[in-house]
Amino acid sequence: MIFFENGFAQPKNSYIAVNTLIARPLAMGGAFLAVDDDLAASLYNPANLGGGSKTRAFSFQLFLNPLTPGLALARREDFYNHSTSASAQAFATLGLLIKGLTLRAGPFEVGAILAEQTTNEIAIAASDLFEVNDYLDNQYSVLALRMRLAERVALGGSLGLYYQSLARKQREWQLRASYGITIAPWPNVLLGVSYLTMPVTPNGGYRNHPERFVNGSVNIGMSFRPYPGTIIAADIRNLVEDENKNEMVREPHFGIEQNLFSVLALRGGAFWKSEDERLAYTLGFGLIDSAKLLLGNPRGALPNWLLNYGAVVEKDNAGQRRWIHALTVGIRI
């Protein structure tokens, strides 16, 4: 769930209610190319799918978002085209509960992200809290594969199916591939490089804001764990771009996360907005690490925060302050 709030006398608000993965990266300034995570990591660097776990034991995990099917039932006109049959709507609604899965076998890890709503600011304009703006016309699914080459080196690639609507109740789709590599020179340091491609529209890129990616860009990142439960991360966006035409240029991103007893994770960060030539600041938190508190921290399991909140505090071109709020709900089983 993402909220766009403008600083005018009558604030404009926009909302995403069905995004599952954005809140944690957003709260950390978007510096996520080398941060351990399950599904969200593969959107920034497919070589980091599943994080830095050293176990090669077989595992299978499902990721659920119970909010999504509830909204689909309550707001069918926003989720589905009028031509969609009732049976197709029922099947799709049930499928919206499952937002992703991961499968690990030896040195290989496969991840799938299912029907994740785009965060493009233009595509998600909405006027009330639970408006979803033609969700199925503006969402994407990603299949990612990670292969661990050695103890501290991994390669990854992903193929994304992206839907976008340039007119109401009309959509087109495109396939895009991305690649990445991670290297851990020391046990508490991880380096990552990714090459990301995504659709481009007349109004901008698919993940241009607040995620700050452009099509055909090379991005680099580093994370450092000075103490257990502490992550310090830094990225440079768009270091090299295939299509450097009036798009964003190189931008530094910084983030930090502090885990407090697996009950609360505090996050903060900042990034440089090249088009406005000013900093944007981020903050957020995670509540209840179910992997440790509810499941006893099974071997190789990454934290799974049941509720994540993230916000960007920025100023627009007119100098007005704006908040971008993100709230996500996710259950891993």
Annotate each language-model stretch with its function.
Residues 8-333:
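Subset of outer-membrane beta-barrel
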